[in-house]
Amino acid sequence: MSTSSLAFLKAKACAEIVAELIASENQNKVINLNALKMRISKKHQLSESPRLTDIIAAIPPDAYLKESLMRKLRAKPVRTASGIAVVAVMCKPHRCPHIAMTGNVCVYCPGGPDSDFEYSTQSYTGYEPTSMRAIRARYDPYEQARGRVEQLRSLGHTVDKVEYIIMGGTFMSLPESYRHTFIANLHNALSGATTEDLDEAVKFSEQSETKCVGITIETRPDYCLDQHLDEMLRYGCTRLEIGVQSVYEDVARDTNRGHTVKAVCETFQLAKDTGYKVVTHMMPDLPNVGMERDIFQFQEYFENPAFRTDGLKLYPTLVIRGTGLYELWKTGRYKNYTPNALVDLIARILALVPPWTRIYRIQRDIPMPLVSSGVETGNLRELALNRMRDLGTKCRDIRAREVGMQEVHHKIHPEQVELLRRDYTANGGWETFLSYEDPKQDILIGLLRLRQCSDKTYRPEFTSQPTSLVRELHVYGSAVPVHSRDPKKFQHQGFGTLLLEEAERIAKYEHGSKKISVISGVGVRKYYQKLGYTLDGPYMSKWL
């Protein structure tokens, strides 16, 4: 069969699949997409089923029930279930900055220019999905961002709201000129501008149709000082991911972290007083810790106000060739927990998580063939949640309760929505966690993090008068395009405005603040302008 004949048959098959999907939608019938694809492929004698991207491309732009069809065809709906499209990009490979002080990298770190995986960035192998996309793009930020946005769009996702995650080691240790160009290109990828000037790129990004709602930067406590925090505000950064790995000073020293746990706690306070959301990386099963100390360190982490971050990534220790830990393992001086013990530990950690914390990840994305010892399965979260069911405990972190995830995994919808408030002290400040929830079904629709800063805050926007700080405002549910509404979804239904009004009331009458400021993604500034906020340095502020 000629190439043109095959292309014609594939196009015909895609059109028939779309027609049957529209018919089933009209008749309110549930249809098995895989069975439909196989039947149509067999009819046209195709050797393989049409790809999802081809079927999506075959839907006419003015098709009746297009949005409903897209929901059925969307690949990996979890990607935008939280209301935004997350786009991970990597900076160029560079050496870890603390090699200059300690003489080497952390004992468990697999990547970097001096490792067995020499074309990879620090702490990555080069075989993770994000790493492979970065290598294909030769670490060009513009190519990485455009490629990933187009890929998500072709898979049926709404990509009007994008959050960047900058991975690949300590970004803030790279030269300033490289950092500025890198961030400018990320903003250009959404706005279509071609400027190399950082401030100009940010201005264009504010007006862009595809909004940059936030940037997350991976860093270390020694690259999270005043000057680094100020620089990241200029980029449009709203969240920091800080490598902690352990709350024990002896473990930080023995694993060659190059910083103390005391420095970590000081960084958390500084970052939160500047308005950032703080996410940490923690590693259970490190050398010389043991099960009892592991459980105790997570109790300490969630209960001690010196820690208590907004989010957490759990990375159980992996033994990978070329690392110091690999040598310890090979000579019998280190041994991982058994798979059953590890699942048990993760289940016990998840039971401790407070409702204002989000568990972003539970294991690394490193391919199993590269792992000499450690996690043996790719579904550790699922196994841990099943173990929790057996033990009669429940995970109440944000991700487990948010409305988008409940719809994707359990097809559960909220019924009676209420405003809930939780207050706690953390990192020298008073934190208020406001949320709209269905308490009966334990479903979270939207949240707001309000902070009365500690007296160590240094930003001039906050020191001249008492100021309260909104560090996060997020309404969950599948992503809805900007300027659009969907009565079946929760974004753009007014929950964000209501949460902000309550935050303003608390700031004025309970904190005694004269001003309320929001750390806002570059693309979200117009939203706050409509609510009476004005640009105040890198923040959006309103006098109370």
UniProtKB/Swiss-Prot annotation:
Pathway recorded for this protein: tRNA modification; 5-methoxycarbonylmethyl-2-thiouridine-tRNA biosynthesis
Sequence ranges assigned to domain N-acetyltransferase in this UniProt record: 393-544
One biological process term in Gene Ontology: regulation of cytoplasmic translational fidelity
A Pfam family the protein falls into: Radical_SAM_C
Entry EC no(s): 2.3.1.311
Similarity field: Belongs to the ELP3 family.
Function of the molecule: Catalytic tRNA acetyltransferase subunit of the elongator complex which is required for multiple tRNA modifications, including mcm5U (5-methoxycarbonylmethyl uridine), mcm5s2U (5-methoxycarbonylmethyl-2-thiouridine), and ncm5U (5-carbamoylmethyl uridine). In the elongator complex, acts as a tRNA uridine(34) acetyltransferase, which mediates formation of carboxymethyluridine in the wobble base at position 34 in tRNAs.
Subunit details: Component of the elongator complex.
Protein name: Elongator complex protein 3
Source species of the chain: Schizosaccharomyces pombe (strain 972 / ATCC 24843)
Lineage summary: Eukaryota, Fungi, Dikarya, Ascomycota, Taphrinomycotina
Gene from which this protein is expressed: elp3
